Amino acid sequence: MKKILVILAGFMISCTSQATNTESNTETGVESDQIQMKKSQNKVIKKSIEKTDGKTLVKEYNEEGELTKMTLPIEISTDQDVVIFTFDNGKLSSYKVNAKVPEMLDMTEIEMDKTKNEVRFISEWSGETYTFNEFGISKITKGGMNGKTTYSYKYDDKGLLLEIVSKSTTTYTYDVMSKDWTKRTGTDNKGNKTVTTRTVEYW
């Protein structure tokens, strides 16, 4: 009986010592791997910079992970023009055009429709309409001498782009990835591939 009591007492002391060490570790800022992994998984993206075929798309988010700003390459005067869109609670709030040749803006009519969450760029020879949702672009409609084409963007519930569909035909399907992806491959319905690289900043 004495041996059993001694063993139990030793076990109690060991448990107490472990609990004390755990408390001490917490107080000194030393965390378990499990807690660190959980924190890593819960990181909120502040800025995402995506590059595809020489084009750069920038998305910025608030600390709650909501999209607040998007810098999108749109060709108005040259292929280096960009438009900066701002968002509030997932809705389009404003836009600003940075054109390499500002004079060309006089030849383009720009209309923003907040109720439809879209912006239209209309010129003598073509027209483009960008429609947004809480994840970014939801649809692009391009019209010109050859008719109109609509590209629909499909996302999963985490906001990851799954595919771009044009005229009921999958234009690009993207490989599976996490929210922290750094390289993504898109494959069109003809087997052609495009590669997007991304750098991410966190809050």
Give the label of every model feature segment.
Residues 17-203:
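Buried hydrophobic residues that stabilize the cores of well-folded domains
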